[in-house]
């Protein structure tokens, strides 16, 4: 059993991108699907699909590469961990990596990117960063 499903999912995506795999499989969790929605909206992944096999759900994530075959994900990192929660206010979420990266934030309005949280005037728990 995995203790931190988000960290496990990010590591699987990172490892698959380094190996230049077409897709990777993640454990299913609603929070992971919400994070993948943000990644998809920001253009860091091609697509994802929830698969139900023998009563167990998993997620297939299709990774995205540029025209030279390099992954569009330069770095993907877990920010808030189970032993140390990290919360960011609205003012700390304005820009990340000059707009090239995204901080995924869990807010009262759901799991959204940092720019959407700034526009919605909300802060929250910083789950992970990607650029």
Curated annotation (Swiss-Prot):
Source superkingdom: Bacteria
Q: Name one GO cellular component term.
A: ribosome
Q: Which InterPro entries match?
A: Ribosomal_uS8, Ribosomal_uS8_CS, Ribosomal_uS8_sf
Q: Which UniProt keywords apply?
A: Ribonucleoprotein, Ribosomal protein, RNA-binding, rRNA-binding
Q: Which GO terms describe its biological process?
A: translation
Q: Which Gene3D superfamilies does this UniProt record tie to the protein?
A: 3.30.1370.30, 3.30.1490.10
Named from the GO MF annotations, one term is:
rRNA binding
The text of the family note is: Belongs to the universal ribosomal protein uS8 family.
Instruction: Name the job this protein performs.
Output: One of the primary rRNA binding proteins, it binds directly to 16S rRNA central domain where it helps coordinate assembly of the platform of the 30S subunit.
Q: Which HAMAP family would you find in this protein's record?
A: Ribosomal_uS8_B
Oligomeric and partner information: Part of the 30S ribosomal subunit. Contacts proteins S5 and S12.
- Listed name of the protein: Small ribosomal subunit protein uS8
From which organism does this entry originate? Wolinella succinogenes (strain ATCC 29543 / DSM 1740 / CCUG 13145 / JCM 31913 / LMG 7466 / NCTC 11488 / FDC 602W) (Vibrio succinogenes)
């Amino acid at each position: 059993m995995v203790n931190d499903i988000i960290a496990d999912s990010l590591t699987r995506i990172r490892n698959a991108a380094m190996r230049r795999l077409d897709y990777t499989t993640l454990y299913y969790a609603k929070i992971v699907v919400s994070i993948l929605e943000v990644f998809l909206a920001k253009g860091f992944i091609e697509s994802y699909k929830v698969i139900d096999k023998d009563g167990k759900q998993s997620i297939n994530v299709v990774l995205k590469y540029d025209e030279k075959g390099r992954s569009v994900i330069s770095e993907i990192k877990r920010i808030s961990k189970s032993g140390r929660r990290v919360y960011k206010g609205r003012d700390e979420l304005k820009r990340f990596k000059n707009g090239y990266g995204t901080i995924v934030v869990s807010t009262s309005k759901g799991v959204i990117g940092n720019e959407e949280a700034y526009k919605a005037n909300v802060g929250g728990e910083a789950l992970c960063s990607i650029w």
